Amino acid sequence: MNFLQRNLFTKLRADNFGTKEEMEPMTTFKKKKIAQMLKNVNDVPAGEVKMNNGFLNRRLSKIQEDEHHAIDTSIETIYLLRIIVANVNGMLANGINLRGIIQLGDYLRTRGDKVDFVKLEKWIAKLRIQRIAQLEGSVLITFFDFEQDEIPFVHHIERGAYKLTLRSLYYNIMDQQAIQFEQTSSGFVRTTGGTMRKNLRRSMRYLQYAPIETMSNFMNNFFRSLSEIEE
């Protein structure tokens, strides 16, 4: 990490997890840069609590419905699952959402003792999001000084957590445009401004962590944008 990145995470840890760290001294120019980076962090939209794949989304609904009627129901475990799923959805759309990761870390530390992690791991396996959930936990370990035993669903630290997280610091709303199509005078349809390429490249970053969700997210965006032409 460079100087600005180190100071940013020092501030995020101090503000959200009560560490006593202090940022290294900065010039006025660098303070403005940190302020912009914090704005970028806050500007990344939160993800919805839904799966991009229709079959998996129905499975998510069933998991929640069944748990509410279970004898040993665990609302805390359901809530943690919802945080993880929202982060997955947001990640595929906009990159790693540090606000969502911080929410995950805060919940683990304040309510983690109430969570049934055996049940949670069964659910994330059913939803095919084991590795991308592990990626979320790896961000907490890599940047927020969490211990691996605080996050039972992390069985090894994902190496990609470092690079993908630093990339998210430079989020720009203009980089997250949906795929755009235009109809030529001859009636053919084509994408504009390289939006197809940008969306595909963004999706490919997470393909190894959640293949079904990643491809479903890309195809949903593709057909949603195409339908706008027809309208």
List the predicted regions and their residue ranges.
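Conserved NTP-donor binding/palm subdomain of two-metal-ion nucleotidyltransferases/polymerases, i.e.
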Residues: 1-231
